[in-house]
Design a protein with these regions (language model features):
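Winged helix-turn-helix DNA-binding recognition segment
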Residues: 24, 41-100
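Short recognition helix of helix-turn-helix/winged-helix DNA-binding domains
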Residues: 1-59, 89
Length: 102
């Protein structure tokens, strides 16, 4: 029996353009991994914002917390995610932005 029961379609843009831009041009493969992880979570939640701390993202992707923090900064700067937090110690929510789908 397969371990995973749900497949998630990934936009062509994410595979054909975004990977090349983030991994090749920006030299931030960690940012691409974090984006793919958030993309998957958001798709499973019908594109609602995803609550995830640095620790959760680090443990889920196998990256260090500092690598995740750098990745999130890049993704926010490139407007690929939006992050909100009620206060400084609250778990932030991340909204995956897909500007190419407009």
């Amino acid at each position: 029996m397969p371990r995973f029961r749900q497949t998630i379609p990934v936009d062509d843009y994410v595979l054909d353009v975004l990977m090349r831009d983030i991994v090749g041009h920006d030299r931030q493969p960690a940012a691409y991994l974090v984006y793919l992880y958030l993309f998957g979570l958001a798709a499973r939640q019908k594109w609602k914002p995803v609550a995830a701390s640095l620790r959760t993202l680090a443990e889920s992707t196998g990256l260090s917390k500092s690598a995740v923090q750098t990745a999130l900064d890049l993704l926010r700067r490139r407007e690929l995610i939006g992050t909100e937090s009620e206060h400084s110690t609250a778990t932030p929510t991340h909204r995956v932005l897909r500007h190419w789908r407009k």
